[in-house]
Amino acid sequence: MSHESLVLRGTMRAHTDWVTAIATPVDNSDMIVTSSRDKSIIVWSLTKDGPQYGVPRRRLTGHGHFVQDVVLSSDGMFALSGSWDGELRLWDLQAGTTARRFVGHTKDVLSVAFSADNRQIVSASRDKSIRLWNTLGECKYIIQDGDSHSDWVSCVRFSPNNLQPTIVSGSWDRTVKIWNLTNCKLRATLAGHTGYVNTTAVSPDGSLCASGGKDGVILLWDLAEGKKLYSLESGSIIHSLCFSPNRYWLCAATESSIKIWDLESKTIVDDLKVDLKQESEMSAEGTASGKNKVIYCTSLGWSADGSTLFSGYTDGLIRVWGIGRF
């Protein structure tokens, strides 16, 4: 029986600070978009040849502080970003310009998402609110106080399930909440974490939600039932989670490594660690900077076909892993 694992295919360098988010196109085209604490968003062209896996095609600037999140519209024409400057921006990728600014949050925006039809936008902030917007930049609804989170809202996602349109949010109040998108009412509060929640992910079919953060434990939830299914121990703070688009895998970026679980057997398929020596051998220029700094992964994104995992790190590099059979 052949065993699948991941190998380093190359790196992508242009950001000068933490890579905070990675957005991959639905059509699997040769581009990705990344955001960074260097206040910029980069549109990359994937060359896939040699150690430099992609080259920066365009740098989008305008945010006045760290860009914390970026997502792509399903047609790949627009990117949506959220920043510690308190704003969201919708970017026209053809023109390389800001098409809309979304102003309303009173503190840092930590997470943004597009609905499946791209007609709705949701954002989460350190102001403890979740805002629902249309693409014109008009705020349609604010989820705040009452049933809402009592601390920073670190992550927000739309479920791809159109039968029961929902928003999933994670917070520093240690809970995950499920919201009914049609009326923005709370459907369930998922409690179980013993530390703040950094990240949530929804499975491609919309049935599962995974959450993770400070306590190093990934909790898997049944979204329809609002029930906890099981937990996975990562052993370190979790910064990002993502489901594979075509395998029953969950990928976690932790402060020690990237861990990939097979959710059927609940075993670790792979544990990816940075090897600076290997990287300097791969690339002609070598890596002189940050020899002694602790480097860890802060963002993840699978290619649409599930063959390639993009990972963004605190040293500003994107490391690209490919699936191989061994």
Swiss-Prot record:
Family note: Belongs to the WD repeat G protein beta family. Ribosomal protein RACK1 subfamily.
Keywords, ordered alphabetically: Repeat, Ribonucleoprotein, Ribosomal protein, WD repeat
Keyword Lyase (UniProt): no
One Pfam match: WD40
CDD domains documented for this protein: WD40
Database matches in InterPro entries: G-protein_beta_WD-40_rep, RACK1-like, WD40/YVTN_repeat-like_dom_sf, WD40_repeat_CS, WD40_repeat_dom_sf, WD40_rpt
Protein name: Small ribosomal subunit protein RACK1
